[in-house]
From Swiss-Prot:
It holds the Pfam family Leo1. GO terms for biological process: endodermal cell fate commitment; mRNA 3'-end processing; negative regulation of myeloid cell differentiation; positive regulation of transcription by RNA polymerase II; stem cell population maintenance; transcription elongation by RNA polymerase II; Wnt signaling pathway. Residues 1-14, 179-193, 575-584 have a biased composition (Acidic residues). The modification N-acetylalanine is found at residue 2. This is RNA polymerase-associated protein LEO1. It comes from the Eukaryota. The modification Phosphoserine is found at residues 10, 14, 66, 151, 154, 162, 171, 179, 198, 206, 213, 221, 230, 239, 247, 255, 278, 280, 295, 297, 301, 608-609, 611, 615, 631, 659. It comes from Mus musculus (Mouse). Keywords: Acetylation, Activator, Nucleus, Phosphoprotein, Transcription, Transcription regulation, Wnt signaling pathway. Its main location: nucleus. It is found in: Nucleus. Belongs to the LEO1 family.
Length: 667
């Protein structure tokens, strides 16, 4: 270990002196790259000034931390470019050898971060940096470190490398272009490292590398051993108090760095998870995969701010401390939940099978002679079966008024004896018991069957049953005992429409219809007297209206006639014309006198041929009669009613004549 300290100590001091001389030029070039880099350098310088007032500066102990961090990040970027060209064997060798100085710089950079955090905690500034500030600081540090590590080259190469690093952040194509420049520097650094480190030290580093890869995390490489060596070299120079402060500051540093990582960096997340305590099997698998095939994501993860692996292992423990059991087994039982003797909740206990309860019972087996063929029969409403044997002593006839219902609630036809299948026991001549029935099934030559029940004949139809759902059971107390399974069913229909069963069925249907029908229609035996009465009343009313109409018309005609013949000689003939006219004059009194003596004679002479030779009085009378007849003919509606109206008119005329005579007598 002493040789390693001498080697690494001389290298660190030489690099610190060289980087101090070029820090001013590099900081100016970094400020031109962006405002974020200037802010980050300004914050680091402020923190260094505050740290100098409280305790001896870290620059005196370890040199310029910012320069070492820049070198470490630049070496990380070199690793990225080297691993992109991992197809050639020379690049793989340069990767392995270049990781040794870069890991030392990474460890020094992590200690620089710890010192900055320690100074920030001792000051009154309690606020943490946001994720954006952290990213800007990391970006500015990367640019600064890239420029400082390349100070041994010419100024043109420094500017070209700084531009290459900017293009690495923009796109992956720029990173591939800068890989050639990085390889030249890596070869230079490899030659210096080979000169300083002896073969014995390399063998010792390889042994320590194996031990650390088994204990810490799956991505262990030569970088880890070099970090550990650099830690061993720097530890004698640091006091115990500073170690305690660094170990205390490493805890928030780790948590802050974990918070700054984005979700897209899957490899970095896997590293952090392995540091926190992933399964040991997963770590071994990742180690084999990453040692065999180095990927770009691993190179990208190297550019992140490295963590102090030793401090992390001291704080959180190694991978061996993590149990490989599942989460469900390690969960403590919920408080208040009942726990069994083994410490497991009762819900997780396996349910014990409940023992079966068996009761042995002896039941006598009933053997019945069911015959060869079994048929399932659903009896129609016109058939019924009497299961008990027929006994004339206990036989009860059916009543007409009562309705007999079957087991399905249907009304059965009341055929009494004709539709009931019965059986009885009788003795033959020898005294043996014989079972007889009033029904039998006959099978004909064509395969059809018929049921003969007394004098009735029913057609029997056979059909198969679908499924084994119909069984024959017998009762054994409260239980049932299966006997057979039905495969075929039988249906019965009346043989003809002349049978008594068919007549009963039709009558029963008619009875049902008659019960529901409330109105009965009877044939008409004659005319309805009420209708005749109403018709006669209507006719009588029409006659009365016609008579009233005729009377009014006759009255009008008489009034018109009297107005035409009114004159002084007509009304008072004796006063004016007694001497002049004599018998030829027409007067009202003369007319009345003629009506008194010979009304009938006047009526007979109206149509006589002697009317032309008569006097003027006869002409006047004939004219009056003709007018009356014309008026009567116009008022009649039918030929039959004309005669009746004429008779009534004559009668009424007579009445008016009589009234006129009475008026004359009064005069």
């Amino acid at each position: 270990m002493a040789d390693m300290e001498d080697l690494f100590g001389s290298e660190a001091e030489s690099e610190a002196e060289r980087k101090d001389s070029e820090s001013e030029s590099d900081s100016d070039s970094d400020q031109d790259n962006g405002a974020s880099g200037s802010n980050a350098s300004g914050s680091e310088s402020d923190q260094d000034d505050r740290g100098d007032s409280g305790q001896p500066s870290n620059k005196e102990l370890f040199g310029d931390d910012s320069e070492e961090e820049g070198a470490s990040h630049h070496s990380g970027s070199d690793n990225h470019s080297e691993r992109s060209d991992n197809r050639s064997e020379a690049s793989e060798r340069s990767d392995h050898e270049d990781n040794e100085p870069s890991d030392e710089d990474q460890h020094s950079g992590s200690e620089a971060h710890n010192d900055d955090d320690d100074e920030g905690h001792r000051s009154d500034e309690g606020s943490r940096h946001s994720e954006a500030e952290g990213s800007e600081k990391a970006q500015s540090d990367d640019e600064k470190w890239d420029g400082e590590d390349k100070s041994d080259q010419s100024d043109d190469e420094k500017l070209q490398n700084s531009d290459d690093e900017d293009r690495e952040q923009g796109s992956d194509e720029d990173k591939l272009q800068n890989s050639d420049d990085d390889e030249e520097k890596m070869q230079n650094t490899d030659d210096e490292d080979r000169a300083q480190i002896s073969d014995d030290d390399r063998q010792q580093l390889s042994e320590e590398e194996k031990g650390n890869s088994d204990d810490e995390h799956p991505v262990a490489s030569d970088n880890d051993e070099e970090k550990q060596n650099s830690d061993d070299e720097d530890q004698p120079q640091v006091s115990d108090e500073e170690k305690m402060q660094n170990s205390d500051d490493e805890r928030p540093q780790v948590s802050d760095e974990d918070g700054r990582r984005s979700d897209g960096e899957e490899e970095q997340d896997q590293k952090s998870e392995s540091a926190r305590g992933s399964d040991s099997e997963d770590e071994v698998l990742r180690l084999k995969r990453k040692n065999a095939i180095p990927s770009d994501s691993e190179a990208d993860s190297d550019t992140e701010v490295p963590k102090d692996n030793n401090g992390t292992m001291d704080l959180f423990g190694g991978a061996d401390d993590i149990s490989s059991g599942s989460d469900g087994e390690d969960k403590p039982p919920t408080p208040g939940q009942p726990v069994d003797e083994n410490g497991l909740p009762q819900d997780q206990q396996e349910e014990e099978p409940i023992p079966e309860t068996r009761i042995e019972v002896e039941i006598p087996k009933v053997n019945t002679d069911l015959g060869n063929d079994l048929y399932f029969v659903k009896l129609p409403n016109f058939l019924s079966v009497e299961p008990r044997p027929f006994d004339p002593q206990y036989y009860e006839d059916e009543f007409e008024d009562e309705e007999m219902l079957d087991e399905e609630g249907r009304t059965r036809l009341k055929l009494k004896v004709e539709n009931t299948i019965r059986w009885r026991i009788r003795r033959d001549e020898e005294g043996n018991e014989i079972k007889e029935s009033n029904a039998r099934i006959v099978k004909w030559s064509d395969g059809s069957m018929s049921l003969h029940l007394g004098n009735e004949v029913f057609d029997v139809y056979k059909a198969p049953l679908q499924g084994d759902h119909n069984h024959l059971f017998i009762r054994q107390g409260t239980g049932l005992q299966g006997q057979a399974v039905f495969k075929t069913k039988l249906t019965f229909r009346p043989h003809s429409t002349d049978s008594a069963t068919h007549r009963k069925m039709t009558l029963s249907l008619a009875d049902r219809c008659s019960k529901t029908q409330k109105i009965r229609i009877l044939p008409m035996a004659g005319r309805d007297p009420e209708c005749q009465r109403t018709e006669m009343i209507k006719k009588e009313e029409e006659r009365l209206r016609a008579s009233i109409r005729r009377e009014s018309q006759q009255r009008r005609m008489r009034e018109k006639q009297h107005q035409r013949g009114l004159s002084a000689s007509y009304l008072e003939p004796d006063r004016y014309d007694e001497e002049e006219e004599g018998e030829e004059s027409v007067s009202l009194a003369a007319i009345k006198n003629r009506y008194k003596g010979g009304i009938r004679e006047e009526r007979a002479r109206i149509y006589s041929s002697d009317s032309d030779e008569g006097s003027e009085e006869d002409k006047a009378q004939r004219l009056l009669k003709a007018k009356k007849l014309n008026s009567d003919e116009e008022g009649e509606s039918s030929g039959k009613r004309k005669a009746e109206d004429d008779d009534k008119a004559n009668k009424k005329h007579k009445k008016y004549v009589i009234s006129d005579e009475e008026e004359e007598e009064d005069d």
